[in-house]
Amino acid sequence: MGLSSILVALMIQPMNIADMQPGSAASVVIIMSFFTILATVIIGVAPVAQIPAYYVPLLTLVTCLGYAPLDYSGKIMMGEVGNHTFAIALGIGFYILGGFVGTLILFIVTTALIAYIRRNNLSRFLINKLHINNPTFGDLFMDVLTGGGLGDLFRKIILGERQQVIDDNLLIALGFRRLFYNPYSPNLERVVEKDVRTKPADLRRLN
């Protein structure tokens, strides 16, 4: 698998974020597994070790369908063991379908799908907790891709105590405010106060 194995391992991050809302991770697994099966059949991907190429995504889909009702009802959640397992299974299915390029493209698509499914909750989180006002879809995407303790650790290592001020409209649209949000910066409050995009209606429109 080579470099593709890194992408497969990185699938764990967005699936972790998806699993923080009941039903979100299950929806992502069902949608992406079904798409992978369909694409594999249409393209006619060759069997791997005499096993049909659609076997991995089909097994992933069937397993998730059996579990999903309890997840949607909020009675249980995948947890780290569950969402990590589904993440790796999806990644392997992506690799079988399209190699490195296919894995990269579907990794991005999966991250975007999670950002879309969780858009309301993520927007509330960015506004209330990180004070990123009027968050763009790029901010949501970057939160799914780099949010959590591991992402913050890398920010601390790379940025130290610096907090980058992002005021370019293109970079804001691409989510660079979330990407460079450094919770370890002593200048964070001053940077937030300078955000010219602050709107009092941000919270009300999400209710």
What role is predicted for each listed range?
Residues 2-16, 20-207:
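Alpha-helical transmembrane segments
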